[in-house]
């Protein structure tokens, strides 16, 4: 039968389209990671795994930040990011979307939910929560130790940070990644990255990074 999707190419039950999108429990997909068959007890035990990865992005201001600012836009960039792809739910293998003939569904993702967002207090933060298509991040061509770029428009001025690839090397299915940015003026002053098993583990021992403001 045809999978219930607008894509008419999917006539195979095991191949499902995926979209990077705002987190919604109803949009999650699962696949059988492994199964055990017990012939004596006549049962099959299946172990399901999240097909998607998940990214939570927090943006706030430093305690000493004196002014109000607006988060106008947020974008993620890496050559290996997927906006659309397909997954074989029998194996968990992610593949290129059949309509992605010119890489039009790869390379970046613009976050739109809740934007623009006014930051008028250190107690407030903008948060984006995304279902991400699993992928191995590629090193930045100019800074090979870094991978995922986060570009934030702060009150009309762009600022960017590139996360060290040793700390965030991929978006793995079934894992949640938390990236927290702190603003000082129109620069991203600090970044922390945490990964969880949807079981938190602090990356880089919680040390903030010094990102590159974008001129």
Map each language-model feature to its residues.
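Low-complexity, acidic Ser/Thr/Pro-rich "mucin-like" tracts of secreted and single-pass surface proteins
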Residues: 110, 168-215
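Short, ordered, surface-exposed loop/turn motifs in non-cytosolic proteins
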Residues: 64-106
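Short, low-hydrophobicity acidic/polar segments
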Residues: 1-70, 114-126, 136, 172-173, ...
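A short, solvent-exposed beta-strand micro-motif common in secreted/extracellular proteins
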Residues: 1-4, 140-156, 174
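Residue-level recognition of well-ordered beta-strand positions that form the cores
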Residues: 58-60, 75, 151-153, 182
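Short Pro-Gly-centered beta-turn/loop motif in secreted/extracellular proteins
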Residues: 126-146
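Extended, solvent-exposed segments with strong compositional bias
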Residues: 98-130
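Edge beta-strands of extracellular beta-sandwich domains
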Residues: 159-167
